[in-house]
Curated annotation (Swiss-Prot):
Expressed in young leaves (at protein level). Keywords: Chloroplast, Plastid, Transferase, Transit peptide. The lineage of its organism: Eukaryota, Viridiplantae, Streptophyta, Embryophyta, Tracheophyta. Belongs to the GcvT family. This is Putative transferase At1g60990, chloroplastic. The keyword Chloroplast applies. It is found in: Plastid, Chloroplast. Folate-dependent protein involved in Fe/S cluster biogenesis. Functionally complements an E.coli mutant defective in ygfZ. Its main location: plastid.
Length: 432
């Protein structure tokens, strides 16, 4: 396959700015950021692959440019077919639900490493000269302080700071990539388009169908990264990302697994997904489906739309401090956030709950018969034992370790959850 055809088939996210031709050097144009990639060591072995190594590094592009437009992936659902053949359960709308190993996968998250297909999550490409300023004004994070190769979490909120969704952002050379929840992608795109004015140089594009997204999580994630010669990302800040070539296809790897600051996220074309997936499994990653991922989301404490994120709760009650800038100036929801901070207006907070029995989301939380909150998510524990939930509880009513009642007679002990425990209120002079 020649270079031009390969680029067309990859059909990834951005138009390549230019391609440089260097004698006797294998180059791959990166559709993410307009650079050319020289191969970097990526060992592929086991699982039927020939042992081979790829060398990659970024090379500056020349002024001569070739433009590539988006096109459909060459083989629709090739990755999902591979999952189905290997025993994975795939829903009608293309979500990898389970590998009949949920408890094993949850154990691997705690003690080993898992890989989960998050391709059903939304991916939004925001391009144009005004993209950073635009997102700076539309979300809670300080985009104007970020540079190419960095990343962050940011929150989409209403004008009154009520929560819509958490977005994970990668700052690339020619665009900003937003990863959002599956249920909010279209509504966020529609909302953003409403705020683009005539003179704004901003373009919004849904690239979910043109890309695949994997998360690698667990304490042994770094070992796999080292085996694949991607160790230069180990220890880098959350959101830091780099572009590579994998089996002749472009892939972007970022620090953080969406559910945790640890682990990694991998973005690639549909054509490269099978090779990446099989290689990660060959290196020891345990596959995880969306059912186990949802259990993990709840036990880790990451808020989700239509559960913890809704017009019922504001962003400070959700405890998403790492995603909020308090001093970047005017942005949507800023006035409400400022008032809440100034007048100590945060009356409730999101907490974990160790429950004595199963409970339905939406159940009332009480203390001494008085309503103090609401259960928003519930999941059973590993191996059919234990019950856990997330819920909003009034600050003055209960603290970590206190007992509350959920529903009629279910006992719940208020607990700390990892995702929220990592959040830290920014100081007044913070530039974040």
């Amino acid at each position: 396959m020649n270079l031009l055809q390969s680029c067309k088939d990859m059909a990834m996210m951005m138009r390549i700015d230019s391609v440089s031709h260097i004698t006797n050097t294998a180059l791959l144009p990166c559709l993410y950021n307009g650079t050319v990639l020289r191969r970097r060591s990526l060992s592929l072995r086991k699982c039927g692959f020939r042992e081979r190594k790829f060398q990659l590094r970024c090379v500056s592009a020349s002024s001569d440019s070739l433009q590539f437009d988006f096109s459909p992936p060459p083989i629709d659902h090739d990755f999902l077919d591979t999952i189905s053949v290997s025993g994975g359960k795939v829903s009608e709308d293309g979500v990898v639900e389970s590998f009949d190993n949920d408890d094993e996968a949850l154990d691997a998250f705690d003690n080993g490493v898992v890989v989960v297909d998050l391709s059903h999550f939304g991916r939004i490409r925001v391009s144009g000269d005004d993209r950073a300023h635009f997102l700076h004004n539309q979300t809670t994070a300080n985009f104007e302080s970020l540079y190419e190769g960095q990343g962050c979490d940011t929150v989409f909120v209403t004008p009154t700071a009520r929560t819509i969704d958490i977005a994970h952002a990668w700052i690339m050379k020619n665009a900003i990539l937003l990863t959002v929840s599956p249920t909010t992608c279209q509504s966020i795109i529609e909302m953003l388009n409403k705020y683009i004015f005539f003179a704004d140089k901003v373009e919004i594009k849904d690239i979910t169908k043109q890309t695949c997204l994997f998360a690698l999580a667990g304490p042994k994630s770094n070992q796999i990264m080292s085996k694949l010669n991607l160790g230069d990302l180990i220890g880098q800040p959350y959101g830091r990302h780099q572009h590579y070539s994998f089996d002749g296809m472009p892939i972007t790897v970022g620090v953080g697994s969406l559910i945790s600051d640890e682990g990694f996220t991998m973005l690639m074309s549909p054509g490269g997904a099978v090779s990446v997936w099989k290689t990660l499994l060959a290196e020891g990653a345990i596959p995880m489906g969306s059912v186990a991922w949802e259990k993990l989301r709840i036990t880790q404490g990451r808020p989700a739309p239509e559960r913890e994120l809704s017009k019922e709760f504001n962003v400070l009650e959700a405890g998403l401090w790492n995603s909020i800038s308090l001093n970047k100036g005017c942005y949507k929801g800023q006035e409400t956030i400022a008032r809440l901070m100034t007048y100590d207006g945060i009356k409730q907070r999101l907490c974990g709950l160790n429950l004595s029995a199963p409970s339905e989301p939406g159940s009332t939380i009480t203390v001494d018969g008085k309503k103090v909150g609401k259960l928003t998510s519930y999941t059973g524990g590993k191996n059919g034992s234990g019950h856990f939930g997330l819920g909003y509880i009034k600050k003055q009513a209960a603290s970590i370790g206190n007992t509350v009642t959920v529903g009629e007679d279910i006992s719940g002990i208020v607990s700390e959850v990892p995702y929220l425990a990592r959040q830290h209120p920014p100081s007044a002079n913070s530039s974040s």
